């Protein structure tokens, strides 16, 4: 059995699909379906069992959780604006620690979701404590377990890998609401209003020129499975493309892919702007000084760990995403 926590969530459900594509169906999916809507993310997946996350946690604490082949731990509170520190630390730090202790006691590989939020305002995205300084309790909840792993690295009984996800986009994120990716919101905006809105220039960047390391969830799944295939490798690794691209690229990919559906030719950025298909709104005063205008993962450690696949750029990945959702007609 392989455990996937957060299995009905965005990255978790895509991981289940990735395992299914390999013919792996003996999966224990752990999540919280109290509100129910996320079940849709698992409808087309094959799993062996579903378990509520609190039931799984009770078994962990009692030392009664069955031994499994591996744990892919994606379950967490991913709302970076959550201000309840106790809730965040319990869900993100403490639960990860409990899975870690279980996996070490039973010699089970653990691959868990960390976050690029650990870097805070740093402009150097290398997996080194000198570059880390989270700006919110979400980032701290992720950093604290990374620090635990560092102190235990020379005593591990089984693989432990922390993946610092950058800006992930792709299918099955619709339940995330305002925390969904820029690509998702751009799609909804264009379909509803016929144009996409981006922030105007600030902090030395042109209109829509603020940049992020946008990574397709398909590449995130591939990275997870790479480490699952290499249980002798442990450590903390950035999970990004190593390529920063502006928000303009995301918006252009969304609009041009949707235009192509109607048989319309692609437009350049200047043409998209001049025709009012991309519009810029004033940069919010309350974000000035608190906004990351640029992120770009250093992927040297990831490459050194043997992951050599070419990752999708925004033009490829976002277009795939748009076509997928339109084919499913599930964008709302």
Curated annotation (Swiss-Prot):
Which amino acids does the record list as binding NADP(+)? 10-11, 31-32, 38, 74-78, 91, 142, 168, 176
Q: Where is the active site?
A: 138 (proton acceptor), 176 (proton acceptor)
- GO MF term list: ADP-glyceromanno-heptose 6-epimerase activity; NADP binding
Q: In which pathway does it act?
A: Nucleotide-sugar biosynthesis; ADP-L-glycero-beta-D-manno-heptose biosynthesis; ADP-L-glycero-beta-D-manno-heptose from D-glycero-beta-D-manno-heptose 7-phosphate: step 4/4
List, alphabetically, the CDD domains matched: ADP_GME_SDR_e (cd05248)
- CC cofactor: NADP(+)
Catalysed transformations (reactions): ADP-D-glycero-beta-D-manno-heptose = ADP-L-glycero-beta-D-manno-heptose
Under Enzyme Commission nomenclature, its number is: 5.1.3.20
Cofactor binding remark:
Binds 1 NADP(+) per subunit.
Question: Which UniProt key words apply to this protein?
Answer: Carbohydrate metabolism, Isomerase, NADP
- Short name of one Pfam family: Epimerase
Q: What Gene Ontology terms for biological process does this UniProt record contain?
A: ADP-L-glycero-beta-D-manno-heptose biosynthetic process; carbohydrate metabolic process
Chain sites annotated for binding substrate: 167, 178, 185, 199-202, 212, 291
Disulphide bridges: none
Query: Assembly and partners?
Result: Homopentamer.
* Role according to the record: Catalyzes the interconversion between ADP-D-glycero-beta-D-manno-heptose and ADP-L-glycero-beta-D-manno-heptose via an epimerization at carbon 6 of the heptose.
Q: What does the domain comment read?
A: Contains a large N-terminal NADP-binding domain, and a smaller C-terminal substrate-binding domain.
- What does the sequence similarity comment in the record state about its family? Belongs to the NAD(P)-dependent epimerase/dehydratase family. HldD subfamily.
Which PANTHER family is this protein grouped with? ADP-L-GLYCERO-D-MANNO-HEPTOSE-6-EPIMERASE, NUCLEOSIDE-DIPHOSPHATE-SUGAR EPIMERASE
Q: Which NCBIfam families match?
A: heptose_epim
By what name is this protein known?
ADP-L-glycero-D-manno-heptose-6-epimerase
Q: Which organism is it from?
A: Bordetella avium (strain 197N)
